[in-house]
């Protein structure tokens, strides 16, 4: 599914989002995809950029016009450029495995995205490896994989299954169980969270690698990396620094950081400055970025059992080998594409709901301020008009 990104002039390098064709200001133009709204610059410039785009759309809604038919015209008037298919060109959705699709659905706690079977899970099964246990040699040995996946991860599966029968978590999918049992670090982690998160983290980790992986990321993913880290080498340095400074057991992640549009007392919601960025984060023990509302794209396991048989205490060698020889950048790019689409759809819904609420409130206040006596009592007329608006 194609999607468009609207970027305020000056916000990003023109080379990153240069338009491939001139904008059409025809009112008949129809755009079926959702949009990311981001004005360039900061402070007043960012706010005014959004208002230039959203205000005409609000006017169209008042006149009963289609919002989608006005988007390109409003973008042109607001001095905003467009670019289609930033991430999804060259990626075949049909090649994504069912496990990856389920993984992304659970990453959002999206109950509706799973199958009926997923929605009524009463027993967690260990997922198979996406490749033979010796496929990552010589960088990760068969012995390490068999111990790591076959013993350590299996322990989490067995212990979690011993806890969920007859509990409040019975019937939940793995992702739902993990998110519902997270206690925000206020006390020791709930055992169900620890085991559910470790199972999820490990499945995500195994699918972050592939035989013959590593190298440079695909072009479109590289554009995001260059934008948010300055360069591929800059991203690698930050990832290595996070791994070297993670005290004890834990994980390092490359994430797509999203945040909901804040509710502000202004005419339009303003995205946060960190909206839609790639970030490196680290987490202790079993914590993962899902509990922060971020979309993980890449993970490396920093528990000692993940690397000690092959690298002993040379954690930095393990991390650099992971990045240079094992990472499946195609998988990372596919995850990024789906994370962007989810964020677009979510924030389009939040923004539309916010605007509609304000429009209804304004219409309601106008009706009450100027009741019209047509037939019957003015108060009855006002009440009838409010009901017609659904307020």
UniProtKB/Swiss-Prot annotation:
Reactions this protein catalyses: 2 superoxide + 2 H(+) = H2O2 + O2
Cofactor notes: Binds 1 Fe cation per subunit.
Pfam families assigned to the protein according to its UniProt record, in alphabetical order: Sod_Fe_C, Sod_Fe_N
Residue ranges of the region described as Disordered: 87-120, 370-391
Residues holding Fe cation: 148, 202, 301, 305
Organelle transit peptide: 1-73
Keyword Ribosomal protein annotated: no
InterPro entries: Mn/Fe_SOD, Mn/Fe_SOD_BS, Mn/Fe_SOD_C, Mn/Fe_SOD_N, Mn/Fe_SOD_N_sf, SOD_C_sf
EC number: 1.15.1.1
Subcellular location: Plastid, Chloroplast
Protein family: Belongs to the iron/manganese superoxide dismutase family.
UniProt-listed PANTHER family: SUPEROXIDE DISMUTASE, SUPEROXIDE DISMUTASE [FE] 2, CHLOROPLASTIC
Protein name: Superoxide dismutase [Fe] 1, chloroplastic
Native source organism of the sequence: Oryza sativa subsp. japonica (Rice)
Lineage: Eukaryota, Viridiplantae, Streptophyta, Embryophyta, Tracheophyta
């Amino acid at each position: 599914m194609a999607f468009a990104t609207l970027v305020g002039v000056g916000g990003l390098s023109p080379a990153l989002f240069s338009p491939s064709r001139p904008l059409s200001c025809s009112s008949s133009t129809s755009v079926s995809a959702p949009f990311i709204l981001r004005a360039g610059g900061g402070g007043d410039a960012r706010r005014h950029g959004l208002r230039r785009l959203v205000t005409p759309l609000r006017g169209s809604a008042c006149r009963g016009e289609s919002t989608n038919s006005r988007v390109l015209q409003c973008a042109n008037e607001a001095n905003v450029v467009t670019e289609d298919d930033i991430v999804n060109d060259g990626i075949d959705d049909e090649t994504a495995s069912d496990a990856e699709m389920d993984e992304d659905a659970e990453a959002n706690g999206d109950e509706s995205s799973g199958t009926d079977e997923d929605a009524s899970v009463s027993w967690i099964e260990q997922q198979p490896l996406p490749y033979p246990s010796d496929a990552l040699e010589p960088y990760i040995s068969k012995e390490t994989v068999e111990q790591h996946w076959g013993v350590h991860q299996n322990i989490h599966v067995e212990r979690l299954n011993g806890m969920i029968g007859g509990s409040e978590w019975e019937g939940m999918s793995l992702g739902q169980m993990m998110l519902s049992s997270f206690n925000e670090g206020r006390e020791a982690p709930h055992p169900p969270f620890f085991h559910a998160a470790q199972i999820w983290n490990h499945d995500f980790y195994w699918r972050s690698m592939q035989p013959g992986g590593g190298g440079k990321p695909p072009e479109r993913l590289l554009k995001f990396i260059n934008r948010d880290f300055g360069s591929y080498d800059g991203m690698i340095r930050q990832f290595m620094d996070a791994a070297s400074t993670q005290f004890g057991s834990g994980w390092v992640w490359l994430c797509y950081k999203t945040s909901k549009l804040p509710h502000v007392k202004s005419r339009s919601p303003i995205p946060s400055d960190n909206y839609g960025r790639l970030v490196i984060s680290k987490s202790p023990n079993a914590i993962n970025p899902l509990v922060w509302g971020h979309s993980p794209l890449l993970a490396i396991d920093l528990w000692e059992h993940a690397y000690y048989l092959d690298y002993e205490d040379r954690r930095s060698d393990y991390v650099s080998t992971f990045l240079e020889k094992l990472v499946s950048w195609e998988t990372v790019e596919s995850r990024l594409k789906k994370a962007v689409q989810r964020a677009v759809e979510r924030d389009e819904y939040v923004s539309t709901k916010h605007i509609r609420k304000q429009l209804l409130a304004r219409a309601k206040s106008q009706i009450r301020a100027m009741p019209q006596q047509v037939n019957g009592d003015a108060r009855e007329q006002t009440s009838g008009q409010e009901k017609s608006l659904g307020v």
